[in-house]
């Protein structure tokens, strides 16, 4: 969206927020919003009216606000028209990201044991082996597309092994994940996505049948065991949780590894500093999470009770969408917010969210990124961007900030 268009737009649509053009100019747009329009009106098609939140303090407040609900059933009465879902989407929506307490607590408790600090540290050697194996394949060529050859396969292999899913199915997950996070309202895309979600549901049904027959020491088997021991987990919840773990278990990390590498490629002084001072890696990861937040916009929150924010009435059933990317560049919180600084102090970014829905896999994503980037820089010391910076394209995607590809030579 050009600056000329921005001045004439009074309401942003879902398709605009999902466009590549928006991604290209989003940071400048957010900067204007933070200065002059803290709440920006959205038209979200069948979902109704919404508001885009751009400031850090507002984001923190609203991410903890109990008047906002993730499950629309806690907002809409039985007589009111509900948000329309795709036919095959219903089976995949009953997960913790779409739930409120007490359901959220119940669902999160079932899986959080697998994501404790101790459990994540036990994966370190395995992740290191995966990183080395992936680089072994591409190093002789002295070239790779970092997205396809490294950033995507590493986390998908890790989460597949945690869940007990055959590795040969990982390319299917990529297609299905894109359908799940695609917020397009174009009729042909909706039809295609519904078809893909149908494929995914069939796959999950088959996978769960197999796990019931042959349980193993993996996370899906543990969820099935919980389901069989009582009313803790419905079948829809089981499918939805597996879907969420697959998608959230790799999408964020793909973008973190890719966006961090891209930021380092574009800021040679910071890359050189990191090479000279590898102990800055943890700080560099936090800055990458802030600078190019892997999740650009939050998933939907529904207003259960009306309230006033900055003089504007937020009505019941209004949708709230928070730009984590904008909050993480709020100059009131982050001095020189548009500068990539791997030694940034007091980096209170909210790239993994805040409150009840803080990302369960944050520790895993950080460890995967640390190993991936450290191994890449150690084994490929002459890494550089293949092509011009202007040739790199952000994907047109509502939720994520993701590059189409990242060609690098070494």
Curated annotation (Swiss-Prot):
Gene3D superfamilies: Cytochrome P450. Coiled coil: none annotated. Its EC number is 1.14.-.-. The keyword Cell membrane does not apply. Heme binds at residue 359. It holds the Pfam family p450. It is an enzyme of class 1 (oxidoreductase). GO terms for molecular function: heme binding; iron ion binding; monooxygenase activity; oxidoreductase activity, acting on paired donors, with incorporation or reduction of molecular oxygen. The keyword Metal-binding applies. It comes from the Bacteria. Keywords: Heme, Iron, Metal-binding, Monooxygenase, Oxidoreductase. Its cofactor is heme. Belongs to the cytochrome P450 family. PANTHER family: CYTOCHROME P450 YJIB-RELATED, P450, PUTATIVE (EUROFUNG)-RELATED. This is Cytochrome P450. The lineage of its organism: Bacteria, Bacillati, Bacillota, Bacilli, Bacillales. The gene is cypA.
